Swiss-Prot record:
Record remark on domains: A pair of annexin repeats may form one binding site for calcium and phospholipid.
Organism, as annotated: Homo sapiens (Human)
Record-linked SUPFAM superfamilies: Annexin
Keywords: Annexin, Calcium, Calcium/phospholipid-binding, Metal-binding, Repeat
This protein's encoding gene: ANXA8L1
UniProt-annotated binding residues for Ca(2+): M266, G268, G270, D310
Protein known as: Annexin A8-like protein 1
Amino acid sequence: MAWWKAWIEQEGVTVKSSSHFNPDPDAETLYKAMKGIGTNEQAIIDVLTKRSNTQRQQIAKSFKAQFGKDLTETLKSELSGKFERLIVALMYPPYRYEAKELHDAMKGLGTKEGVIIEILASRTKNQLREIMKAYEEDYGSSLEEDIQADTSGYLERILVCLLQGSRDDVSSFVDPALALQDAQDLYAAGEKIRGTDEMKFITILCTRSATHLLRVFEEYEKIANKSIEDSIKSETHGSLEEAMLTVVKCTQNLHSYFAERLYYAMKGAGTRDGTLIRNIVSRSEIDLNLIKCHFKKMYGKTLSSMIMEDTSGDYKNALLSLVGSDP
């Protein structure tokens, strides 16, 4: 399943709108959970992980109207650590959350290139447009200009190209001659020569539709006798290699890509909690069920079982509630 289809697959949703929804009692439940000494974390989990993002925004409005307080700020003051980070992430409207993740990836010393690559390579053009709009509204600057200021070289070029690209202008028609020409151009830009023409790779990967790219990858393998992924690994390195491989992976199978991100967020010593939280929150109302199925096929274990092994406490319980039952 390619990435451009994932946005319309409602069977992939793990967090759905609650039926018979009324924001007022939910807001009251949250207020009581945080009133006085101590906090009822389970009550917070039961409400916020079982409501859609739209419903959470309504709960926040009701909370403000009934109690005169900002719900997100109240949650921040009552919770802490990874659990706080997860619950607060649930309170952001989707585009604003992704804008925040991009902003956080660039602020301060160092840049988290992996976060930027993940978001820009896996979202459609319309989604990126909304993220750019939210970014400018919330931070008063252009996402494109901030990326240009914070990165350099070919990485900067591929990230800006992804922001401006037309990969999701999907057509059932693919020009076989153009696909073959693109495959030949990629071969000539890498395997055929000493050195690499990085801009040729960037231009084709970032400006062609997904259906077209799938045909290009097939033709490339016939010409080069190796996959496009293997060629990228041998011709590039570092963050540019990661960006190109991410575009290829998302074109071939978006759900497998996110399954891989979640797996490596928990594999080995330590947990990459930012990656774990971001991908579960952002995909829970899109295709997390489909990601769970690919996760089990790829790694022989369920996503929820790995979460149980790798996390603990209220943080674990909230993640499991968002992920839902095993496939």
